[in-house]
Amino acid sequence: MLYNFIHNIHKEGYIFIMISFLASCIGFAISCSLGIICLVISLLCIYFFRDPIRMVPEGDDLITSPADGLILDIKEVNSPIDDSTQVVCISIFLNVLNVHVNRIPVSGTIKATEYIPGRFISASLNKSSELNERQRLIIESKIDNRSIIVDQIAGLIARRIVCNVSEGQQVNSGERFGIIRFGSRVNLYLPLNTHISVFKGQTVIGGETILAYLQDAPKQLTVKSI
């Protein structure tokens, strides 16, 4: 039971949880009120860094959501890696209550990763996509070798982006690849002829919600727990 509890918390949260629980012990030694405040902070840390198991639909042509959150926009834009190419950008906003663990959206190979320094304006603003600190992931899809781009974007509160994959690595849809601490945004850039299956304003679940299909939608889906 303890193993399952720890396993369902992202390792980036361990230090915050340990410090806050230690502060709770010290707080209770000083006063009950201070101890309760520190304990509440500890529980909030556990909630924020939770990493639940997800039922991931299987299929190399599926594009699943890389994050929990709200779809802010779906629009055609210039590719962030090639101004001469148009792509579809799906922007997902994560508030502080969402699960912040990020997941691979499509099975394939990591073609490149890039850290881009920047500012920390609110991730709910469209200009944050170009101005804020972000980590870029380019995935070559397994089914047709097309490039799928994922940008982890820091927000007003988020000041730490973690990306745990490297160039040349083989990845599968739904696998965990990183986390953004606190409020943030994830942009997903897809080829123009991708079949989009979500809409602006929709709430999505990382690893579970199918955002798009690289080919026609399958008649039947199978799922796996990750």
Swiss-Prot record:
List the subcellular locations. Cell membrane
Pathway participation = Phospholipid metabolism; phosphatidylethanolamine biosynthesis; phosphatidylethanolamine from CDP-diacylglycerol: step 2/2
> Is the keyword Lipid metabolism assigned to this protein?
yes
Q: How is it modified after translation?
A: Is synthesized initially as an inactive proenzyme. Formation of the active enzyme involves a self-maturation process in which the active site pyruvoyl group is generated from an internal serine residue via an autocatalytic post-translational modification. Two non-identical subunits are generated from the proenzyme in this reaction, and the pyruvate is formed at the N-terminus of the alpha chain, which is derived from the carboxyl end of the proenzyme.
Identify the EC number(s): 4.1.1.65
Catalytic residues (positions): S184
Q: Which reaction does it catalyse?
A: a 1,2-diacyl-sn-glycero-3-phospho-L-serine + H(+) = a 1,2-diacyl-sn-glycero-3-phosphoethanolamine + CO2
Give site residues, Cleavage (non-hydrolytic).
G183, S184
Cofactor field: pyruvate
How it assembles, according to the record, is: Heterodimer of a large membrane-associated beta subunit and a small pyruvoyl-containing alpha subunit.
Summary of the function given for this chain in its UniProt record: Catalyzes the formation of phosphatidylethanolamine (PtdEtn) from phosphatidylserine (PtdSer).
Protein known as: Phosphatidylserine decarboxylase proenzyme
Source lineage: Bacteria, Pseudomonadati, Pseudomonadota, Alphaproteobacteria, Rickettsiales
